[in-house]
Amino acid sequence: MIFQDGSKVSMANTGIFFHYQEGERLRDFPDALEGILSRDNVFYYDAFYPGKPPTDYDLELIPLDLVWRVHSYDMVERVRRTHDFDGVMLSVSGTVAASRRVWSGEIDNAFVFTGYGDHHAGFDSFGGGCYFNGVAIAIRDLRVLFNARRFAVIDTDAHHGDGSWEIFKDDIDVLYVCLCHGGGFEENNNVNVNVPWRVSDAQYVDLIKKNFAPRAAAFRPEIIFWNWGYDGTKGEYGDIGLSTASHTMMARELKRIADEVCRGRIIVVLCGGSRRDMAQRLIPPLIRVLTGE
């Protein structure tokens, strides 16, 4: 497909990973994906639950020893004692399952619904609605299972991914680029890009083009993870002035980058955002971009 600005998006097989402990903001899903789930190039994975007939697309829980490869034993035990633990494990399992299937070529890209975010979870700390760092766990898993070597992570949540920064700052095989207010510094392959308090859609996408695209082209990751939050949208709790249209603009640019540098392998992991109506409005068109519509 060719858009008015001349950009192109290639068709792709897209996986959608969902479970039913997602919280109020995702109450309208998966019903809100009507017209998407019926496509031949869309594959829907969800958790097995009592009364659901087993299918080839069930989401299985990862073992805890995979979590311990990224987080301390004490931290895992603290999370285990919370009432959110089951949903946390399903969220992380979705990210791991998506990365395995994208890597193996079963699907080209993926969107992972999570009830609990990623990027505030560090080695021994969690907060801000983030318990385990699913992207970091998925990266570790790909290294062990497939000998994968180079990864890129772009974070467009409105807040700094302090947990991801801590985990990746000394890892020379992970390019981590975070767009957030108060950025403007880098360490090894960790880059914080400063975003003004108020920013236009075009300015924000330009930050991706100038700060992530050339680094990804030079770094040549084998797969890209996108920590996507919609909390920076107008009317959300992290409002930085972005319109609802900005998210499909980001998706088109990041899919283009993935198509060019890593054979289209990109996994979108839902992070911040609280409004139910906003999720219903933003997520379906973003997934359509992944499919190549």
Language model feature labels by segment:
Residues 14, 52, 60, 64, ...:
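Sparse, context-dependent recognition of short Cys/His-centered cofactor- or disulfide-binding micro-motifs
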Residues 1-62:
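N-terminal low-complexity, Ser/Thr- and acidic-residue-enriched intrinsically disordered segments
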Residues 71-293:
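A general "terminal functional-core" signal
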Residues 26, 64, 92-95:
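A general structural signal for well-ordered alpha-helical segments in protein cores
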